[in-house]
Regions:
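Extracytoplasmic copper-binding redox domains, predominantly the cupredoxin/blue-copper superfamily
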Residues: 25-240
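Positively charged n-region of N-terminal signal peptides that target proteins for export
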Residues: 1-4
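Hydrophobic alpha-helical segments and their boundary regions
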Residues: 6-10, 29
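N-terminal signal peptide c-region/cleavage motif recognized by signal peptidases
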Residues: 21-23
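Bacterial N-terminal signal peptides
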Residues: 9-19
């Protein structure tokens, strides 16, 4: 069954709360019997807006004046780096195998990765550049962390323990921008260059699915997963 989702203005309270950070909910990992898959594509059908970046310092590292899109859209309208996730999932598949601590890297006056999803917990902030960066994360208007990194190769650990959207700025380079989405369950995906995503091993049942991109903001939609079957979605983002 294929559904077309469009942006709504009456977003559920949990989505709005997630923008400012809420405590992580308990999640029980275990075997999933008869899990289904949510396969989909995120699209943007309007004209792609851009912003003009004018570096006013450290141009030898940061580069020159340039135009950059506010949303990455491919020739078939697929949106890259949109985040899709399920909310209020109390039980299901295991988290991905633990590796190194997630990183937010200041590299050539950009945040790498620009968009990432992490489990509530530790984060390392890194400076790869030979210049000062001041990396500042916000849940809404509330500071999540604020750290000066004057030295190349510097690494500072921090914790993001609340679920929600964290906007990342650099107080030394005002055009830098990144996004971290902190989640409390492993049912999430980031769209590829073609706008497609897949969320696997979802226990049968009804859920709220959220898709979000920094320019358009979030969209939420009920979704029902049937045992052993795929649910196919096309999600259309629009500027709020």
């Amino acid at each position: 069954m294929k559904k077309l989702l469009t942006l709504t203005t009456g977003l559920v309270a949990i989505v709005l709360a997630g923008m400012i950070g809420v405590p992580a909910q308990a999640y029980e990992a275990g075997p999933v019997t008869g899990g289904g898959t949510i396969d989909g594509k995120v699209v943007f059908n309007d004209a792609v807006p851009t912003r003009k970046i004018i570096p006013n310092k450290d141009v030898e590292v940061c580069g020159g004046i340039r135009e950059e899109p506010l949303i990455a859209v491919g020739p078939d309208k697929g949106v890259q780096n949109a985040v899709v996730y399920l909310v209020e999932v109390a039980k299901g598949k295991a988290w991905p195998a633990a590796g190194k601590t997630p990183e937010l890297d200041n590299r050539k006056c950009r945040f790498e990765p620009e968009v990432q999803v992490i489990r509530a917990g530790p984060l390392d902030v890194v400076n790869d550049d030979p210049i000062l960066h001041n990396t500042h994360g916000y849940y809404g208007k509330r500071t999540a962390f604020n750290m000066a990194l004057p030295n190349q190769g510097q690494r500072i650990p921090t914790e993001l323990t609340r679920v929600g959207t964290v906007r990342i700025d650099c107080d030394a380079h005002g055009w830098m921008e990144g996004w971290i989405y902190v989640v409390d369950n492993p049912y999430y995906a980031i769209t590829g260059a073609d706008g497609k995503f897949s969320i696997t091993d979802v226990p049968p049942g009804s859920y709220t699915l959220v898709a979000i991109q920094s320019f358009t903001g979030p969209i939420q939609q009920p979704v029902t997963v049937t045992a052993g079957k795929p649910t196919n979605l096309t999600i259309e983002l629009k500027k709020q």
